[in-house]
Amino acid sequence: MSAFCIGSEMRGLTQIRGANNVFPTVVALKSLAAEVRVLLGADCQIGYAADWSEYFGYLPKDDSGDPFFHLDPLWSDDSIDFIGIDNYMPLSDWRDGPEHKDAHWPAIYDPAYLRSNIEGGEGYEWFYKSDAARAAQVRTPITDGAHDEAWVWRVKDIRNWWSAAG
């Protein structure tokens, strides 16, 4: 066996925060990775495949504004060889009819439109604060006034998340 994934898309578990901001499922996944390493040996690549909204960090809904890079201890563990991201991020915000914010593009399936939303669009340049905002297409820009690190808040900014990992 050349590779083994110890789990996938456990967002509901990996984001449970315990005492002292420890994430118990992440601790358990590190332990599991070490056990799998013993069983499968050094030649087998081991990883975890995070949900696209889980890989970069955890943003608690406690008004603190504090992000937690809760999976970093797993990603940096000696028993982990690869980071998997189950990547099905939004590629468009297309609406039926001619009256919507993306209507200036020729069509939902236009390659340039779709490309522009890989490192752009929802989850990169802007987000919706609520279901009502989504329905009305009230887009809130993603910024970071405190540290000029907007990538922290952009779920689609894999390039800068990875660059900051160093």
Which positions does each model-derived feature cover?
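Noncatalytic carbohydrate-binding groove/subsite architecture in carbohydrate-active enzymes
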Residues: 1-2, 8-166
